[in-house]
Every structure is written in C-alpha cells, then in structure tokens.
Design a protein with these regions (language model features):
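Short hydrophobic clusters on alpha-helical segments that form packing/core surfaces
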Residues: 1-4, 76
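Short, flexible helix-adjacent loops and helix caps
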Residues: 5-9, 50, 54-57, 92, ...
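Hydrophobic/aromatic residues within well-ordered alpha-helical segments
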Residues: 34, 41, 45, 72, ...
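Amphipathic alpha-helical linker/stalk segments
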Residues: 43-75, 81-82
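Amphipathic alpha-helical packing segments from all-alpha helical-bundle domains
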Residues: 67, 82-89, 97-131, 137-142
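C-terminal peripheral helix-coil segments that are non-catalytic and often amphipathic
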Residues: 71, 78, 116-135, 141-177
Length: 177
C-alpha cells in the first residue's frame, strides 16, 4: 500500500511484488490484472472498520469538541490523500484500458466506506456534543468532510490551504466576525 500511495498509477507490478515480498507471477495467480490488484488495495485502504477504529483512536484523548474536530480534520486529511492517490491510479488504469469515454461510477466499497466514515464522525465526534450544535451530528459530519475535501483537493494550491486549527475554528464559529 505505501508503494501505491507514493507512486500512484506509475507503480509497476514488479515494484508491487517486490514490496510484498513475492514473485510478480504470484500476484497474477491471485489477481487477474493490475486493475484488480489496485481495487483490492483501495478496498483494503478504505476498510470501514479500520477507518472507524482509526478515527476513534484519534479523538479518544480529546477533551472538548474543538479538540475532537481538529484531530478528525488531521486524520481525515491523511486518509483522503491516500485514498485520492489510489483512486487516481485506478482512474488512470481505467482510462488506459479504454474506459475513459465516460466517468466511472464510484465502486460500491467506496460509497459504503464514505457512508460509514461519515457515520463514525457523527457518532464519535459530534453526537457526544449534540447540545452544542445548531445542526444534527450527521450534518456536522458532512460539513466537516466537505471542508476537508475542499481544502486538500488536488486542485487547491498548497499556499491556499488552511491548518486544521483554522478549519476547526471556521466550522465551529463560522465565517462572520
């Protein structure tokens, strides 16, 4: 997985096999092609149980809502960068295989992982502080996730990005003075 995160679509099956400590042919006994291998990696990376456990660990020691939100933003950013790298690799492979005429729909595991991660944010971060919110915990989770995605989207320049502290402040206190 780190190899794919580092190299994305340019990672070769030889590099992947070496990183896994197996012969390249072994990969193709398990996976029919590089696309299937990358999908398996993406599905592993997005494992909803692992995502929820990682989030729960990230916010476990946070005493207040702001600390939980900052920890969640930092954890979500790291996860999003990894996911975007792997999903970009998948998109390149689909395009190279002739599937580039229309945008592919997201794989079912991606939709499910996103839904469960939003539920985990709502449950672990916002539900314990529901009385401090003007919206439901689920709506707060969606807004947080949208801010993180927008701030660290590949099209956003590094100079324009705000820190987790800044995003948490905007999320919890708004934009107005």
């Amino acid at each position: 997985m780190p190899l794919l995160i580092e190299h994305g679509p340019t990672a070769t099956t030889r590099q992947i096999a070496e990183a896994a400590g197996v012969a390249e042919g072994t990969l193709f006994r398990v996976f029919p092609d590089k696309r299937a291998l990358l999908f398996a990696v993406a599905e592993h990376l997005l494992d909803p149980d692992r995502g929820e456990a990682t989030l729960a660990d990230a916010v476990a020691d946070a005493a207040d809502l702001e600390s939980k939100v900052i920890a969640t933003i930092e954890q979500s950013r790291t996860r999003m960068e990894q996911v975007l790298t792997v999903m970009t690799a998948l998109r390149h492979i689909a395009h190279d295989e002739g599937g580039g005429d229309r945008p592919p729909s997201p794989p079912a595991f991606l939709v499910e992982a996103n839904r469960r991660f939003l539920d985990a944010i709502a449950d672990h971060v916002f539900a314990p502080h529901a009385d401090e919110l003007r919206v439901t915990p689920q709506e707060a989770a969606l807004v947080l996730r949208s801010l993180v995605f927008g701030m660290w989207h590949p099209g956003t320049s590094a100079e324009s990005r705000m820190s987790a502290d800044q995003l948490a402040s905007i999320l919890l206190k708004g934009l107005a003075r």
